[in-house]
């Protein structure tokens, strides 16, 4: 016997006797906080877990001073819309956060939940919809509910973390194709088709309508067209497309005019709706299957009434005020064209999500963002290693309907000034010590 268990028949016993049990909590204590947590002393409260204060919008306070904020998915500006705030308040006063008590299958069903589902399904062009308590949890639950160990999944390599976590629960075979590479998708579909002939299962293809980091679109129409050659069920996560893409904001599948070819459509309330919760929609038999088999909804409390009442008002505003979406796209086009005119790399975004790509390490990224926030009073999100490859920086800008063209012009000028400093090497210094622990020490 060789390898892990040694070179003799007794090697198995010998090496098992010498395996040292590890305490889980000690392992966590000794691993320096994980790939991102290792920076906690530098990042917490500033680069990670920053505290933005005030009404949600383009102007908020960060550490006591006003900043121009480009870091919220409040696409249509509904978070502080007076009618939305009023609906949220009415829901809280009339029903409270406790209502309805229990899971919907047992005691948590209301006519308002049913009305919201009917209206959502009609808006996105599907037969029925089912409310989910949270988007992240909802996607995990959809995947878990759909699949058996006999099934195969084919998914985009840049799928959101909620999709990846859902796939981790799947005990069958998984096939991944490079981001938006349709030729490779065909190859993986062929492999999956051969596999399920042996297992007696089916194939699920998963992608996103709008990819939230890069802003590019999933090639939904091309994937739907592949149904002529392959038998599969198509699941689309359209979290960033709902309310922003397609005619009347009905989503990315409508943008591509292929909604009938999307079998399972997922959307969240956390972006354009500026709320909490999510929904999945499709044919009635499928949604009924989810209602009676999705464990995260069977064994969890129903979505609270203030969120349901608030969601009804938000949907009404999306349906009746196309000018909000038009304004979003006016700001988006001005921002993205401005970056292109100044020769910034914003990749292949076709949505409001605007990534600005720069070159540099963690130190340069943190010093650049520190400069934006402290010198220019401009707040945006930064992504760097280990989330993306070493040497890359992404500054993620999210335009909204409540930003102004003056905000766009100011931001473009700020980025131009920071790029000049980056190219001169002025950000090649130690990470700034601005985490809460240092901030609090200085305040004493």
Question: Where are the model-predicted features located?
Answer:
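Conserved PLP-anchoring active-site segment centered on the Schiff-base-forming lysine
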Residues: 142-161
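Short, structured coil segments at secondary-structure junctions
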Residues: 149, 169-171, 261, 342
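Active-site C-terminal subdomain of aminotransferase-like
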Residues: 230-233, 240, 245-350, 357, ...
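PLP-dependent enzyme catalytic core of the Aspartate aminotransferase-like
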Residues: 2, 90, 94, 118, ...
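N-terminal "arm"/small-domain region of PLP-dependent enzymes with the aminotransferase-like
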Residues: 2-21, 25, 29-98, 232
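Active-site phosphate-binding strand-loop segment of PLP-dependent enzymes
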Residues: 175, 179-236
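Conserved PLP-binding catalytic core of the aspartate aminotransferase-like
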Residues: 48, 325-336, 342-376, 385-387, ...
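Conserved N-terminal alpha-helix of the aminotransferase class I/II PLP-enzyme fold
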Residues: 86, 90-134
């Amino acid at each position: 016997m060789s390898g892990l268990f040694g070179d003799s028949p007794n090697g198995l016993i010998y090496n098992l006797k010498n395996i040292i049990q590890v305490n889980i909590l000690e392992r966590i204590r000794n691993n320096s906080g994980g790939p991102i947590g290792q920076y906690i002393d530098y990042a917490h409260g500033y680069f990670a877990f920053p505290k933005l204060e005030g009404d949600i919008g383009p102007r908020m306070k960060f550490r006591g001073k006003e900043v121009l904020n480009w870091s919220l998915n409040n696409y249509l500006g509904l978070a502080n819309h007076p009618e939305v705030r009023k609906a949220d308040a009415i829901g809280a006063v009339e029903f409270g956060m406790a209502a309805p008590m229990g899971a919907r299958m047992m005691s948590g069903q209301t006519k308002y939940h049913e009305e919201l589902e009917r209206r959502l399904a009609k808006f996105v062009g599907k037969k029925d919809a089912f409310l989910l308590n949270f988007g992240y949890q909802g996607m995990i639950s959809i995947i878990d509910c759909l699949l058996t160990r006999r099934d195969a999944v084919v998914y985009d390599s840049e799928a959101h973390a909620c999709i990846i976590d859902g796939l981790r629960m799947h005990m069958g075979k998984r096939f991944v194709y490079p981001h938006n590479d349709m030729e490779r998708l065909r190859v993986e579909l062929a492999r999956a088709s051969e596999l399920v002939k042996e297992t007696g299962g089916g194939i699920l293809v998963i992608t996103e309508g709008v990819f939230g980091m890069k802003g590019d679109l999933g090639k939904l129409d091309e994937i739907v067209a592949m149904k002529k050659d392959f038998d599969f069920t198509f699941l689309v996560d359209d979290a960033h497309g709902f309310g922003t893409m397609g005619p009347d904001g009905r989503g990315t599948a409508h943008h591509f005019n292929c909604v009938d070819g999307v079998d399972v459509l997922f959307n969240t309330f956390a972006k354009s709706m500026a709320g909490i919760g999510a929904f999945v929609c499709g044919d009635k038999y499928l949604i009924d299957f989810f209602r009676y088999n999705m464990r995260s909804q069977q064994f969890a409390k129903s979505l609270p009434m203030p969120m349901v009442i608030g969601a009804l008002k938000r949907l009404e505003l999306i349906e009746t005020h196309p000018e909000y979406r038009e304004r979003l796209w006016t700001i988006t086009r001005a921002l993205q064209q401005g970056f292109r005119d100044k020769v910034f790399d914003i990749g292949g975004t076709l949505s409001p999500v605007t990534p600005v790509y720069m070159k540099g390490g963690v130190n340069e990224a943190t010093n650049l963002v520190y400069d934006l926030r402290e010198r220019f009073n401009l707040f945006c999100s930064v992504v760097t290693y280990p989330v993306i490859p070493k040497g890359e920086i992404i500054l993620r800008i999210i335009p909204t309907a409540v930003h102004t063209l003056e905000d766009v012009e100011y931001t473009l000028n700020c980025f131009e000034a920071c790029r000049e400093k980056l190219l001169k090497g002025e950000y090649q210094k130690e990470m700034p010590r601005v985490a809460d622990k240092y901030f609090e020490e200085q305040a004493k």
